[in-house]
Structure formats: C-alpha cells, structure tokens
Amino acid sequence: RESERSRGLGDVYKRQAVCCNAYLDGLELGIENKIMPCETYIVCTEPLDEAIQNTILPNNYCVSDTNFDLNYYRLSSSKRMIFGGAVGYSLKNVEGLKKRTKRQLDKVYPQLVNHKIEYIWGGLIAITVNRVPDIGMLNDNIYYAHGFSGHGVAFTGIAGKIISEGIVNGKTSELEAFEKIKHKNFPGGRLFRMPLLVTISAMQRMMDVFNV
C-alpha cells in the first residue's frame, strides 16, 4: 500500500506491506468476510532409523492427500516425520488438536505408533469457502493475497510474484485471472458463521471417513 503524508515542506510517499492473513481482526471487512481463521498443527517425530524410513517414504516424497481436512507430510533432512493436517475452529481446544494430529499420523503410518513426538507447532491459517486463494486489489492501491487454505508454502511464492509484477507493470493477466474468481462471504455473519462452519466441517470429515 502506498501512503502519502504532507509535512509542509514537501510530500512523503511510503510503500507499506501489512502482513495479516488469518489475523485481520476487523482491519478490512471487505476481504475479512471471505476468509475463516482456523487452527492447524504439525507434529515432528524423533529421528527414524533407515528400516522405518524405507517402509513409509522410501523415495522421500512430499505427500498431500485429498481429504477435506487434508493431511500433508514428509521426512525432514534429519529423518524425522513431519506430519500436519488436523484442523480446528474453536480456537480453544489446542491439546485436542495436538492429540488428533498424532492419531491421524498413527492411522496413516501404524508403524510409527510407538515413536515419540518431539516437536509440535501450529497456529491460525485462513481458508476460503472454495479453498482457492483470494488475490486481488482494493481501491487501486492495495494489493492483497490470503486464504491459501493450507497450501501457503506452495502458493505464497506464486502470489508474491503475481503481486510484485502487478506493482511494477500494472495489472497483469495473472492478477486479473485471480480477480475473476468470485469468492463468497462465509455465511452466518459474526454470530453464526463459526457454528455453521463447524457443523459443515464435521459433515465433511464424516465423508472423508467413509470415502464419499
């Protein structure tokens, strides 16, 4: 965002980057209503021996499944399993999310049940209704990108490139393509949007369980 301030002796122009993502907290309702903050956690095991490594990811691939609340995982350079995916919306049940992440890991790889979790971290991410990133402009001078819906590591670099090219060259075809995506507001307003999302998400998880 470019801002202007007059001091009487001249004009000062500044370029600002405001980093909020899931933490907008009323800063800009026009785009805040298009995202929902939710919690996600990642666990990291103790180092795994080579025999175990060969039974889980012998080619050291990075994996992401197609569940509504997707699981994603890979081996670190220190041969630990890094596994994430449990999503919560209450913003309160942190311990429950940590345990659910470990249960998901054990379900995918039963051979890791007895391996210790040494590190856990997490926080808020921003999701959109259609799970597609929301990238665009406000007032012709504010570029924004958020709502990566759990794919931020991959998409934020692409979004940064799209926005930087827009700043330098003006609105590009890539930016216009994202602006054509009609992102819906989360239903329910401030009072009911969270209960509605929790209910819908529970239904989606059941569909994941039964492979519907």
Per-region residue spans from a language model:
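Short, solvent-exposed loop/turn segments at the edges of secondary structure
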Residues: C38, T66-F68, N130
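Short glycine-/acidic-enriched loop or helix-start segments at secondary-structure transitions
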Residues: L27-L29, N54, N93, A154-F155
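Short Gly/Pro-enriched turn/cap motifs at secondary-structure boundaries
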Residues: E32-P37, Y61-S64, G123-I125
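Single conserved hydrophobic/aromatic residue that forms the stacking wall/gate
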Residues: R1-Y13
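C-terminal catalytic lobe of FAD-dependent flavoproteins
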Residues: F83, V87, L91-N93, K98-V209
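Conserved hydrophobic/aromatic beta-strand scaffold that supports enzyme active sites
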Residues: I42-C44, Y72, D134
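Central helical "cap/lid" subdomain
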Residues: D11-Q53
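Conserved FAD-binding catalytic core of PHBH/FMO-like flavoproteins
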Residues: L48-M81
